[in-house]
């Protein structure tokens, strides 16, 4: 399993200390998924209460990237559930950060992937509208997430850098 053999994610505290330019997310997120620490290049989506583009993204090879989903902060439905967490893990995504909610928490927690979201919510999102934007900068939790930049998450928080830190 490539996810389990990947090198350990650097500590956000070390990354933040060594990189004064690092952006640090406001501490708004709950941790889900079987991995509490994850990092990788960013892929971005902006959607609202429709997870069609989220599904389309996690069906693609993740190649160790982290999918950052700006769901507008909506807590009225979940954008990621157990099925999408399984797809993301199977397709090599390192993690998912959701400015919104998730569901099927037990299923997500059973997957070898890191997930951050604002909350859990039992209602599923709309499907099929395919509305949203892919690959654009998204802004939430006091941070600008740009496609191809680098994100690191662990129990201390979420840090964003222009590129992977020197090891």
Question: Language-model segments: which ranges?
Answer:
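A generic "binding-loop/recognition-motif" signal
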Residues: 84, 156-157
